[in-house]
């Protein structure tokens, strides 16, 4: 079992700050609509079930959830979103994988490329950064749902690969082929997770202890976080405790 560290592989996600609430809601609505295109019955659509679970956790109003599902199943709706993955490299071998959901791939590609370029990085071809990561299922529970031992034992019994723990969340990593089954089994024991998705986990991390480089990296990930099309991103870096205390608290 891997102990989770706040300095390890910090993943910047759409924040809960007031100034980002509208953007977070828009992201949740898009994910629900995209998921619902595969069917509106959550019993047979685990991705939609996970999207609704995340929306409820983040207090997306019920009427907006229902409208997002209806929007996806409206035959007169011609709005199409595409899921795109970008891979980027910056200094010291740091790799970042960006997952976007967009209705304009040219716009999103240009914006993501500009962000990397501005802070000393470049987009690279498929596989040139992702080989540094494992692709797997990621299931995130609030830590209050169970003791770490209970969740660990249950998840490992079901075939999970690893678990990271901290005071706020328990994160379960699963093989993709077992992802849906493990969600369902754990949900029966602990309730549905805060969020669940197929994502990326670095095989090794690069320690950032230089202040100037850390500042540049933070600006880059903040710019990604501020982009409406970016859903998630994953990096193979970790900040030293000194950098974390000086710049991130």
From Swiss-Prot:
Belongs to the TACO1 family. Its main location: cytoplasm. The keyword Transcription applies. It comes from Orientia tsutsugamushi (strain Ikeda). This is Probable transcriptional regulatory protein OTT_1378. GO terms for molecular function: DNA binding. Pfam families: TACO1_YebC_N, Transcrip_reg. It comes from the Bacteria. Keywords: Cytoplasm, DNA-binding, Transcription, Transcription regulation. GO terms for cellular component: cytoplasm. One of its GO terms (biological process) is regulation of DNA-templated transcription. InterPro entries: Integrase-like_N, TACO1_YebC-like_2nd/3rd_dom, TACO1_YebC_N, Transcrip_reg_TACO1-like, Transcrip_reg_TACO1-like_dom3, YebC-like. It is found in: Cytoplasm.
